[in-house]
Amino acid sequence: MTQKMTMADISKQLGISKMTVSRYFNGGYVSEENRIKIDAIVKENHYTPNKFARSIRSQSNIIGFIAPRIESYTTSLVIKGALAAANESNARMLFHATGFSHESERQAVSEFNGLNALGTIVIASKHSIEEPFYNGLQNIIFIGKQIPTHCCLYYPEQAAITALVSHTIYQLQQQQAPLTAIQYIYDARMLSSRTQLIQSIISDIAPTLPNALQALADSEKKDDYQSIILQPNHIYFCATDNIAIRLYRRAKEQHLKIGHDIWIVGIGDYDYSDLLVPSLTTVAFNHYQMGYQAVKKLIKRDSSSCEGEFELKIRESSQFI
């Protein structure tokens, strides 16, 4: 018995998006070239779409959710909050991971915007804040970045990072730690504004200490960390707790003791950050509430932007022990 063809199969065979295939079956706009291709494969395979696929366009309780990575820890918290709010309001959510692809983000926004939906939530990438494509689009909420022309739920990064950097450096100075330099390690695919912000804050707070940046092409790949040579008496600020945790392994490989030879600080406060040895100093943001509020704002048609909250988590990795 042959397996029934799906929209995903059609999308894969033709090299077009699943949303394009969905628009074809729901009477939406599809280019003539793609329409001819889909016509041919539908007739050849006697394909008929299932009821769920055909009903998507007719539903008005759908919310699109777009993120660079659905599986990241912080994104998962935003999703949990969004789903909780959606369930309370009998709304349904459709998710799309862009893989940090600029074109994938644009295409997903266009396709969600074409549905009869409540709106779209976008976890901002560095493309989101530069892209004129978004000008004029309605019912879009950005999370993680402040963009004047749209509704945004943004984190108080300047206040949080200033507090984190200043507290860490002042504490080490009070403990008479032999701190000689500062380094910031980040993922090149992430928002560049955080990199610029932390570099400025470090220069203001510790102007006499040398500081440097190091970019990782992909912070999820273990091999990318092999280029990092940790130096004694350096403090390493990391763009995420995940990067910081990878540096723990590098420190062990290089026989450096965290809290004595070097100091490591993260951003994000993952579930297991306080379970590390030594426990990781970091800063926590209210990701769950951001997701929850984003859905509620779409439902209420509230386009006002708002700032989130943060909490410092000062632990052992930033102390001279």
What are these regions (language model features)?
Residues 123-162, 268-280:
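Flexible loop/hinge segments that line or gate small-molecule binding clefts
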Residues 3-5, 43-74, 78, 89, ...:
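N-terminal helix-turn-helix/winged-helix DNA-binding helices
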Residues 1-59:
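N-terminal helix-turn-helix DNA-binding module of bacterial transcription factors
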Residues 92, 116-124, 181-187, 231-243, ...:
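Periplasmic-binding protein-like
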Residues 164-213, 306-320:
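An alpha-beta-alpha
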Residues 87-129:
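Central regulatory/effector-binding core of bacterial HTH transcription factors
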Residues 227-321:
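Flexible loop/turn connectors
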Residues 148-183, 221-225, 284-303:
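Hydrophobic alpha-helical segments within soluble ligand-binding/sensing domains
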